[in-house]
C-alpha cells in the first residue's frame, strides 16, 4: 500500500496517519480547554521567578526552553526545507511575534495586575471575532461574551503607565499570533505543530539579544533552570500545540470568541486551587460568557 502524500511531497506513515485519526476524533473545544488551563499555570510559575531573575530573562527562558523541547520532540527544521518563500516568511513573522509578544506580556504583568493585562489582551480577540460575526446570531454571541468578560475582569486603570504600553503591545501581538497561527495550521498536512516548532526556534534566537543576560543567573542554579523550563512547557509548548490542534478545525472568528472563556477558567481555577470564591458579579459574567459561546455557530472559514 502506498503512503499518503503531503503537499510538501513527504509521505505520511501509517503510524502518523493513525495518530492524526485519533486526534481528529477529539473535539477541537477540548484542545482549547487544555490550552486555557495551562494559559494560567505558566504565568503562576513565572511570577515566582520574578523575585530571582530579571523579567526579560524569564521571558527568554520561556521561549528558549520551549524551543529546546520542540527541537528534541519534532526536529522542526525538516519542515522548513520544502516551504516556499511565502511559507518561510510566515514562519519568520510568527517567530518574531512570539519573541516580542512573550517579552511584552511579562513586562506588562510585572507592572500591572494579571487580570488587567488579560482583559486588555481580550480586546484584540473581540476585534477578530467581530470581523467574522457575519450573522445576527453570532453578533449577539459576541455582545454576550464581551459583556461577560467585562463583568469578570473589572479592569483597574491603576499602575505604571509603561505597563499599559506593554499590555496594549501584547494585545496587538496576540492578534497577530492568532492570524499567523491559523495560517500555519491551515496550510495542509500534519506539519502545523512542526511549523510552530520552527517558529519557536526563530523566536528563541530573536529574543536572545535582550533576554539571555537576564537569564544567566539561572544557569548556576538548577532549580531556577528547571522552573524556567517548566514555564516554557506550561506557557508555550502545551498551550501553543493545543492552539494549533484547535485552530486547524475552528475558524479564526470562532477561536477568537472562545478566548472569552479564558477569564472563566481563571475564575474557576482560582476558586478550586486558591479558594478565591467568585462574587455574584463573577457568576453573572461567567453565565454571560457561557451563553455567548453556546449561542455562537461556526461559519465557513472564508476569512482565512
PLM features: residue spans?
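Membrane-interface interhelical linkers
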Residues: 1-37, 66-93, 134-140, 157-159, ...
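Specific alpha-helical transmembrane segments that line the substrate/conduction pathway
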Residues: 57-67, 98, 105-134, 170, ...
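Helix-helix packing/entry segments at the starts of transmembrane helices
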Residues: 61, 117-123, 181-204, 236-272
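Transmembrane alpha-helical segments that form core, pore/gating elements
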Residues: 70, 128-129, 145-147, 152, ...
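Hydrophobic transmembrane alpha-helices of multi-pass small-molecule transport proteins
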Residues: 123, 130, 137-156, 170, ...
Amino acid at each position: 500500500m502506498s503512503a499518503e502524500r503531503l503537499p510538501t511531497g513527504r509521505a505520511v506513515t501509517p503510524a502518523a496517519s493513525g495518530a492524526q485519526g485519533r486526534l481528529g476524533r477529539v473535539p477541537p473545544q477540548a484542545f482549547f480547554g487544555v490550552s486555557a488551563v495551562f494559559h494560567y499555570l505558566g504565568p503562576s510559575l513565572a511570577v515566582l521567578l520574578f523575585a530571582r531573575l530579571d523579567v526579560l530573562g524569564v521571558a527568554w527562558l520561556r521561549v528558549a526552553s520551549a524551543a529546546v523541547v520542540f527541537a528534541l520532540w519534532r526536529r522542526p527544521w525538516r519542515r522548513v526545507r520544502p516551504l516556499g518563500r511565502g511559507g518561510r516568511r510566515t514562519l519568520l513573522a510568527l517567530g518574531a511575534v512570539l519573541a516580542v509578544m512573550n517579552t511584552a506580556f511579562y513586562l506588562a504583568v510585572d507592572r500591572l495586575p494579571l487580570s488587567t493585562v488579560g482583559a486588555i489582551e481580550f480586546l484584540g480577540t473581540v476585534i477578530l471575532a467581530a470581523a467574522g460575526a457575519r450573522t445576527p446570531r453570532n453578533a449577539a454571541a459576541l455582545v454576550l461574551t464581551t459583556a461577560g468578560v467585562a463583568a469578570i475582569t473589572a479592569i483597574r486603570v491603576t499602575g505604571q503607565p509603561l505597563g499599559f504600553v506593554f499590555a496594549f503591545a501584547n494585545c496587538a501581538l496576540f492578534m497577530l499570533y492568532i492570524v499567523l497561527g491559523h495560517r500555519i495550521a491551515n496550510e495542509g498536512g500534519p506539519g502545523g505543530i512542526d511549523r510552530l516548532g520552527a517558529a519557536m526556534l526563530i523566536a528563541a534566537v530573536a529574543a536572545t539579544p535582550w533576554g539571555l543576560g537576564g537569564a544567566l543567573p539561572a544557569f548556576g542554579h538548577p532549580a531556577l533552570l528547571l522552573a524556567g523550563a517548566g514555564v516554557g512547557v506550561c506557557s508555550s509548548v502545551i498551550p501553543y500545540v493545543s492552539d494549533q490542534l484547535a485552530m486547524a478545525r475552528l475558524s479564526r472568528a470562532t477561536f477568537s470568541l472562545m478566548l472569552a472563556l479564558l477569564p472563566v477558567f481563571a475564575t474557576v481555577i482560582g476558586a478550586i486551587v486558591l479558594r478565591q470564591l467568585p462574587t455574584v458579579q463573577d457568576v453573572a459574567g461567567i453565565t454571560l460568557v457561557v451563553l455567548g459561546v453556546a449561542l455562537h455557530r461556526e461559519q465557513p472559514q472564508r476569512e482565512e
